[in-house]
Amino acid sequence: TFPLQLGSKLCQGKSEHCSITLSLISRFTLMMFIPLVVANARITDFSHANYIPVLDGDVLVFEQRDLLKHSSNLSEYASMIDETQKLSESFPHSHMRKLLEVDTDHLRTLLSVLKVHHRIARSLDFLGTALKVVAGTPDATDLFKIKITEAQLVESNSRQIAINSETQKQINKLTDTINKVINARKGDLVDTPHLYEALLARNRMLSTEIQNLILTITLVKSNIINPTILDHADLKPLVEQDTPIVSLIEASKIRVLQSENSIHILIAYPRVKFSCKKVAVYPVSHQHTILRLDEDTLAECEHDTFAVTGCTDTTHFTFCERSRRETCVRSLHAGNAAQCHTQPSHLREINPVDDGVVIINEAAAHVSTDGSPETLIEGTYLVTFERTATINGSEFVNLRKTLSKQPGIVRSPLLNIVGHDPVLSIPLLHRMSNENLHSIQNLMDDVESEGSPRLWFVAGVVLNFGLIGSLALYLALRRRRASREIQRTIDTFNMTEDGHKLEGGVVNN
């Protein structure tokens, strides 16, 4: 566009021939530049940047989680079972009484599973999930026991939403029906058909509710939410959000609290506040030194950029929680003054970071992407490809067969290096080893340039033997000199005062 604007100004007031010539030149320029852009669209140079931003689709950012609460009072269930057992005696027909007794026994067995009692830990805990699914009994680690009353639980968080109100309403409605039938009896006669149907219906609802609780507690260990405990009428606050309920539930966290006869199931779902672009950030090595990036994921929103943590990928969306602290990487990409630390580079020269994404760090490489001609590059580059890429003879395959990640735009903030952290890593040790081997090789080259290595070896051997011989001769002469000194001292002690030597012999009388 700049050449066109400049040419139009030059051709103002000129003939039509000037405009035609300018148009031809512009077309030729575009024909020259378009192939160059296409050929290098998958290889982006980041050699002079401080970091590499990679766009990784959309992300939903939340600052807090709201709670869904499912509470169950086991003592109420037990009292309903006792009531059914007492009322079963009012039925004259034995088959009705027998069916109700079977129901009450089954409900008591299910209810005993949820009671707080000591459980012996399994030695083979990896069989726990399979055994629990078959038997329907959670083990000791499935229940997070805490002494907390229901009132304290409700007061602890004002954002809690009860989600089992509809089920409880239906159970209470059946209980009211049973009470009406009993109160409407005439003398000792009871409307047994209606009472029997109401008791059976309530037993079925109790059995379903208790089994749902058992399955929910069993799945909590894997952070899987049992959808049967959710009722659409209780999820209206979630429907108000633009995000589908299924995705919110996938990104939720669940915990079970039990106190005496009360079980509370808490589901913490994300309250989405922003819809942004997800940016993955990678460091760039300069002379084997990189910036220390404590957090490597950002959310590039319409008006601001946030550092995010705890990202969860669901079937349709990615959820991330906004980080509260100011980080180096956030300041870098937001274009603010960034206070950063550096550390020794631990990056490999050819580093595949995701499907269809490879980073070349301070290295020379022959690169070919998706069947394109081979290109020689040197420095730090981001290579993206849809199917395959060949780098220095090694082939990389994109298993997804689609290119969902694109290079982002690097900001140019004011970078302040406030410290260097000497972090030790395997790549650093490997690089130090290579440097040592290179130094040794240089030393050997210097020795070879001065003469034959065999000649230097012989000269060294002769010199060593000469030094050893000189040392041995010196020690021998020193030992002989010491012996002479000792002999001279002995001779001195053997002399008399008149200068004659003492000689041994026999004295004659």
From Swiss-Prot:
Glycosylation site list: 73, 392, 494
Coiled coil start-end: none
Keyword Glycoprotein among UniProt keywords: yes
Record keywords, A-Z: Glycoprotein, Transposable element
InterPro entries membership: Gypsy
A Pfam match: Gypsy
Protein's name according to its UniProt entry: Retrovirus-related Env polyprotein from transposon gypsy
Organism: Drosophila melanogaster (Fruit fly)
